[in-house]
Curated annotation (Swiss-Prot):
Region: Disordered, residue numbers: 392-427, 454-487, 665-694
Subcellular location(s) per record: Cytoplasm; Nucleus
Location (main, coarse): cytoplasm
Bias-annotated ranges (Low complexity): 396-412
This enzyme's EC code(s): 3.4.19.12
Protein's name in the database: Ubiquitin carboxyl-terminal hydrolase BAP1
Residues flagged as site, Important for enzyme activity: 184
This protein's GO CC annotations: cytoplasm; nucleus; PR-DUB complex
Underlying gene: BAP1
Origin superkingdom: Eukaryota
Compositional bias segments (type: Polar residues): 465-487
InterPro entries: Papain-like_cys_pep_sf, Peptidase_C12_UCH, Peptidase_C12_UCH_sf, UCH_C
């Protein structure tokens, strides 16, 4: 068994199929062409191919310093899987097994699992013999090797004997106990390259080590003709893309369900979402009382904010109030007000989503705080307590006039901030909504992260927040696991949140309101990637109503189970101090949902194309492997027999020999007819005669 091992080529497809034959799942091998480019996904180890004879000479020139890094401690050596190569032509399998058996995250399968447990605690020599005594490994190795010719070819004069004596060798680089090791089956012990830095990945350490090694090897006398090959053992790309594709399809279904729910409510209430047809600051004839809507209280920040009121024409019924008076008529369609910080990165400061029925019961503002609250020009724009305090301020003014200058002046008197005057035309211009625009939110590039629907305003536990991730869906690579809870918070990097506030003095319950929010839960250092939850409050799906004495401030989705204090109170204090909460939600309009759906569809198409490419690549690996391992002797013998039976073989042989003779004659004639040489000879002879005459 130990005498029949064949040589293997350095090909990523061959090693990938060899891994599958070993019974290992979720692993593939990729070739590395550029050391400076990062590798997507987790890297389990590296396999390095070099010309062994030249490598040995170059290391001998450098000096015996490499021997100082040998690990001779038996406990350390026997604890890892390091086997000496005792079988010829088995270095490729040795290097691959050294990576697979030293990585606990890999699913090894029955064959390698049995080998790993059987050789536990053995020395390198015993492990080397154990590899040769596993018939499954030997069969898998030889099944991907090129068959040896039965008859040795005639000696070719064009190949030197020195070149034929050179051999190539495989070694592996793995990590064990936070240290980088080089495992060479021809060495007696592993080579320890030491730990890597605290703030770097182990692949950066390997990049420096392998670059230094290649530099030392190419610095020799014959180093220019040394050929290297580097391969990385990574996670299976097909499984990664399949997982990502399933997540994207789940997110698409969630968004579709959200749109169906929004559409169902809109059908019942005759609410229509359409393109912007008219933009005005104060709609004539339809101005509500200030104590019934906090939107107009926000207009006191008009000196620094741009407000676009998107209004759709519908009938305007009168709405009775609880105190017997009548509220000024409002349109029975959806009216949304977007108040945006002028020139601040495209982040929405305040966003109100107001859904009105033919009988208005409640107007619920949703607040979005700025992304960075430590900037002076933003902290002055945020009220200390938007919910209850803004209601008192709005109630203090009896009516809201139709002049934006009056609203801004009242804001300056309240907060002590003297705003610069703005022309009303700047707000009333029909293109104001286009200038403000439906700004691209930072979450729209993360469609590949999990979404989930929560119906109702009940206390729903959510993962603790942490730093914001700005990776797009296409840059995530292999990180698709669920978010991990973390207590780490970031005071500098926060994202906006939608909040639903019930104002005091309103004895009526909340109206049937559907609120679509995207909740982002962020992980801390060492945790998983951020995830998103799509929260939908639907009255038809057991939406919890708020009583007359209830007041929900902040994000109701962020309230943890229990008393509801703790993090919520800390976040509220931070909000009162001019800060923003780190764990927040985004308010969605149907247009936003449609844009999100479009982005998810685009990501699905990209992911499907990548998955298709990986599947085609795997098929190509199998085709190349069949071409490599197929024995063509029987086919060639049968073809020559058929030619001989038809009398064509002798003619082809004579024709081939004749062509070779003609080529030889023509080459000889060309060598004899060298005109430049004759001219030189004539010139030399004439010079000799001239000298003699002189």
């Amino acid at each position: 068994m130990n005498k029949g091992w064949l040589e293997l080529e350095s090909d990523p497809g061959l090693f990938t199929l060899l891994v599958e034959d070993f019974g290992v799942k979720g692993v593939q091998v990729e070739e590395i062409y550029d050391l400076s480019k990062p590798i997507e996904g987790p890297v389990y180890g590296f396999i390095f191919l070099f010309k062994w004879s030249e490598e040995r000479r170059s290391r001998r020139k450098v000096g015996p310093s490499m021997e100082e890094s040998f690990v001779v401690d038996e406990d350390i050596v026997n604890d890892m899987f390091f086997a000496q190569q005792l079988i010829p032509n088995s270095c490729a399998t040795h290097a691959l097994l050294s990576v697979l058996l030293n990585c606990p995250q890999i699913s090894l399968g029955s064959t390698l699992t049995r080998l790993k447990y059987f050789t536990r605690g053995m020395g390198p020599e015993s492990k080397g013999w154990a590899i040769g005594n596993v018939p499954e490994i030997a069969r898998a190795h030889n099944s991907h090797a090129r068959p040896e010719p039965r008859h040795l070819p005639e000696k070719q004069t064009g190949i030197s004997s020195v070149r034929t004596a050179e051999a190539f060798h495989f070694v592996s680089y793995v990590t064990t106990n936070d240290r980088l090791f080089e495992l060479d089956g021809l060495k007696p012990y592993p080579i320890d390259h030491g730990p890597w830095g605290e703030k770097e990945d182990w692949t950066e350490k390997f990049r420096r080590v392998i670059s230094e090694r290649i530099g030392n090897a190419t610095g020799g006398e014959n180093g220019h003709d040394i050929r290297f090959n580097l391969m990385a053992v990574v996670a299976d790309r097909r499984q990664q893309y399949e997982t990502k594709l399933n997540t994207l399809k789940t997110n698409r279904q969630i968004v579709l369900e959200a749109l169906q729910q929004v559409g169902g409510v809109n059908t019942k209430k005759s609410i229509q979402y359409a393109e912007v047809s008219h933009v005005c600051l104060h709609p004539p004839k339809f101005v509500p009382c200030s104590d019934d809507c906090a939107i107009w209280d926000a207009l006191r920040y008009s000196s620094a904010l741009r407000c676009s009121l998107i209004q759709h024409g519908c009938e305007h019924p009168s709405i009775p109030r609880s105190d017997g008076s009548t509220l000024v008529s409002w349109p029975s369609c959806v009216t949304s007000v977007n108040i945006v910080v002028s020139g601040h990165l495209k982040y929405v400061l305040l966003c109100f989503s107001i859904i009105l029925d033919h009988k208005l019961e409640k107007l619920v503002p949703a607040r979005l705080d700025p992304i960075k609250v430590n900037e002076p020009h933003l902290t002055s724009l945020i009220p200390s307590a938007f919910g209850r305090e803004s209601h008192h301020k709005s109630k203090a003014s009896s009516t809201v006039t139709s002049s934006s200058a009056a609203a801004s002046s009242s804001a300056a008197g309240t907060d002590g901030v003297q705003p610069a005057e703005m022309k009303p035309d700047e707000f009333l211009h029909p293109d104001a909504s286009r200038r403000v625009g439906f700004l691209e939110m930072p979450w729209r590039s993360d469609e590949a992260r999990p979404l989930s629907i929560h119906t109702g305003y009940s206390k729903i536990p959510s993962p603790a927040p942490s730093n914001e991730s700005t990776d797009t869906a296409s840059e995530i690579g292999s990180a698709f696991n669920s978010p991990v809870r973390s207590a780490n918070r970031s005071a500098l990097q926060t994202i906006p949140e939608g909040s639903i506030t019930k104002q005091e003095g309103d004895t009526k319950t909340d109206a049937n309101i559907i609120t679509v929010c995207l909740k982002r839960s962020l992980s801390g250092e060492g945790g998983g990637p951020p995830a998103k939850r799509l929260h939908i409050g639907d009255p038809d799906m057991a939406l919890q109503r708020l009583g007359s004495g209830d007041s929900v401030e902040g994000d109701p989705m962020a309230l943890q189970g229990g008393s509801g204090t703790g993090d919520a109170q800390q976040d509220q204090h931070a909000l009162q101090a001019g800060g923003a909460r780190p764990n927040m939600a985004h308010a969605f309009a149907p247009k936003d949902l449609l844009a999100l759906l479009k982005n998810v569809e685009t990501e699905i198409q990209i992911c499907e194309q990548h998955l298709k490419d990986e599947i085609e690549k795997r098929k190509k690996y199998k085709v190349d492997d069949c071409r490599r391992t197929h024995n063509y002797d029987d086919f060639i013998r049968t073809f020559l027999r058929m030619l001989a039976e038809q009398g064509q073989l002798s003619k082809l042989v004579d024709q081939h020999v004749l062509v070779r003779r003609r080529q030889g004659v023509s080459v000889g004639r060309l060598h004899k007819q060298r005109k430049p040489d004759r001219r030189r000879k004539r010139a030399r002879v004439s010079d000799k005669y001239r000298r003699k005459k002189q």
